[in-house]
Amino acid sequence: MESAAGYVRDRCVTGIHGLDEILRGGIPYGSTVLAAGSCGCGKTTLGLEFLVRGAENGEACAHFTATEPSVKLLDNVRQYDFFDMKMVDKGLINVFDMDVLYSWLGLTKATFDLGDIHALIKAITDIVNTIGVTRLVIDSVTTLCYKIQSEQLIRDFLFTLGKKLSTLGCTTLLISEITSEKSGVNMWSSFGVEEAISDGIIVLGDVERMGHLLRFLQVVKMRGTSH
């Protein structure tokens, strides 16, 4: 957002058609953004394209998958014209299985307590810091948060993780799964706290018009920029 003094905040150009125009140049660097939508609306594709466009510019990117194994994810994404497996082979896009990370940390319990959350945050931020990640996607934050004991712990987890990632200069997309019923009453997350903690909210969905199903993308919230 441009101030009276002419200040313009640096942007992370998403490279996604139409989105950068809406955001006046991209997502403000270091933001944590919720990408919310119901099943099949393109959330995972949005997140992967966000990483690919960064990798094309030589950025180190990371994808933490909690909903499907990384092998299956990569097999599915090969169909898209924008994706090139060479980016994975060269280490520009790094894909991590959350289940493997849980096992490595010894987090075998059904639900996570405060100590578990701190261990998980440290593991994620250590990976970001070691690789020099500037773009990160967690898909989905909903699946991850189902393992956290309480709403307050979810809030603490997301706030602390977002703050640390921002300090490291990492722009983050948190994929949020919502039902069509919730999307109709302006709820962009499953737990009701994710949207308050996030710097931005991008909503994906579809709507029927004259017998045709149309896809839409809406920026509901984005701190630091007009939209």
Per-range role (PLM):
Residues 124-125, 147-180:
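Substrate-engagement module of ASCE P-loop NTPases
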Residues 170-227:
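Phosphate-binding/switch region of NTP-binding enzymes
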Residues 12-16, 20, 29, 44, ...:
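Amphipathic alpha-helical transducer elements in NTP-driven molecular machines
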Residues 2-10, 121-122, 126, 130-131, ...:
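Conserved P-loop NTPase
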Residues 57, 131, 167-169:
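Helix C-cap/helix->beta junction micro-motif
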Residues 1-83:
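The Walker A/P-loop phosphate-binding site
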Residues 59-143:
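Conserved inter-motif catalytic segment of the P-loop NTP-binding fold
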Residues 6-9, 102-118, 144-155, 183-186:
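Flexible beta-alpha connector loops of hexameric P-loop NTPases
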